């Protein structure tokens, strides 16, 4: 090797290796501080792209699981309302069986019909007012609610909904009594009593009380086969309840599957982008040793040109 002053090959080589060891140490420190093996595309371009797709899927499936839980809540809310409708129908059927007994007076039947009417109005109220997050689920506005249960397009589960009220159940004109039509009559004012007048041959007349106005009433026809009609209504409610129960079970299974998929994808992503601390601590120690050794060697390499001066003495 020639003895030169302008170019110190040994120092340049030591400096180059020192720069490399500095990069190793810096990379190890970055990974240890972030917990990630891939902090930018330069670390692993293909791995970074794969991990990014996994992240998109994990976030989408996590939200899909929340959507499915919302779907379960919708089905539970609707089924709870149908359960109350069922209770009212059961009571109406009980009253109808009671009304079929021949020992009931007209007054008894009227009392039974009043409760039947109130129960039917309650069914209509439940149908009109039952809602989830502002969406009415039993008034017919929504026939099917789609729940997004996947991270991609068209991955949905439909919840069948429908209108359930007295009209839909064929109970709009349901009656356990039969009434004839009544014509309207105007109110009649009271007439004062007329005292007797023997001189003029006028007999006394008692006071006539006022007669209230009689409003017209249409004839009410008793429902034919009322118990069969109610059984069909109950079957209609049961059919919708069973459908909601089935979709609840399906959504619960969907949530479990989504959670398993999220766990597996998260584990796969971790294997790609997360830092192995045992490896990185080893790399950091190696980088530190190389830095210390490189610095020491560079200092010695810088002394090599000094030996040329001895030739000038």
From Swiss-Prot:
InterPro entries: Flagellin, Flagellin_C, Flagellin_C_sub2, Flagellin_N. GO terms for molecular function: structural molecule activity. It is found in: Secreted; Bacterial flagellum. GO terms for cellular component: bacterial-type flagellum; extracellular region. Residues 190-211 are annotated as: Disordered. Residues 255-266 are annotated as: 2 X 5 AA approximate repeats of V-N-N-L-N. Residues 5-33, 97-117, 252-298 form a coiled coil. Keywords: Bacterial flagellum, Coiled coil, Repeat, Secreted. Sequence repeats lie at residues 179-197, 199-217, 255-259, 262-266. Residues 190-199 have a biased composition (Low complexity). Xenorhabdus strains undergo spontaneous variations involving a large number of phenotypes. Phase 1 variants were motile, whereas phase 2 variants were non-flagellated cells which did not synthesize flagellin. Effectively, the fliC gene is not transcribed in phase 2 variants. Belongs to the bacterial flagellin family. Flagellin is the subunit protein which polymerizes to form the filaments of bacterial flagella. This is Flagellin. The lineage of its organism: Bacteria, Pseudomonadati, Pseudomonadota, Gammaproteobacteria, Enterobacterales. The gene is fliC.
């Amino acid at each position: 090797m020639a003895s030169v002053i302008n170019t110190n090959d040994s120092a340049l080589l030591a400096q180059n290796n020192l720069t490399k060891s500095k990069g190793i140490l810096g990379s190890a420190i970055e990974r240890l501080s972030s917990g990630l093996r891939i902090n930018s595309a330069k670390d692993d371009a293909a791995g970074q792209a794969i991990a990014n797709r996994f992240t998109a899927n994990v976030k989408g499936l996590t939200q899909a699981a929340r959507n499915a839980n919302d779907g379960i809540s919708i089905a539970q809310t609707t089924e709870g309302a149908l359960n109350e409708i069922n209770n009212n129908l059961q009571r109406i059927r009980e009253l109808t069986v009671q009304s079929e007994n021949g020992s009931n007076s007209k007054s008894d039947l009227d009392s039974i019909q009043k409760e039947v009417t109130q129960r039917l109005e309650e069914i209509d109220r439940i149908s009109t007012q039952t809602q989830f997050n502002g969406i009415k689920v039993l008034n017919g506005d929504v026939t099917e609610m789609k729940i997004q249960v996947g991270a991609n397009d068209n991955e949905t589960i439909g919840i069948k909904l429908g209108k359930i009220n007295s009209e839909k159940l064929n109970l709009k004109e349901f009656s356990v009594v039969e009434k004839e039509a009544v014509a309207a009559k105007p109110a009649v004012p009271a007439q004062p009593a007329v005292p007797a007048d023997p001189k003029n041959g006028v007999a006394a007349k008692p006071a006539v009380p006022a007669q209230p106005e009689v409003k017209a009433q249409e004839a009410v026809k008793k429902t034919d086969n009322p118990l069969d009609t109610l059984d069909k209504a109950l079957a209609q409610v049961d059919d919708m309840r069973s459908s909601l129960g089935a979709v609840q079970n399906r959504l619960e299974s969907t949530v479990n599957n989504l959670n398993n998929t999220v766990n597996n994808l998260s584990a796969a992503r971790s294997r790609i982008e997360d830092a192995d601390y045992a490896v990185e601590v080893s790399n950091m120690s190696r980088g530190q040793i190389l830095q210390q050794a490189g610095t020491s060697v560079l200092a010695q390499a810088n002394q090599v040109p000094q030996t040329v001066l001895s030739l000038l003495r």
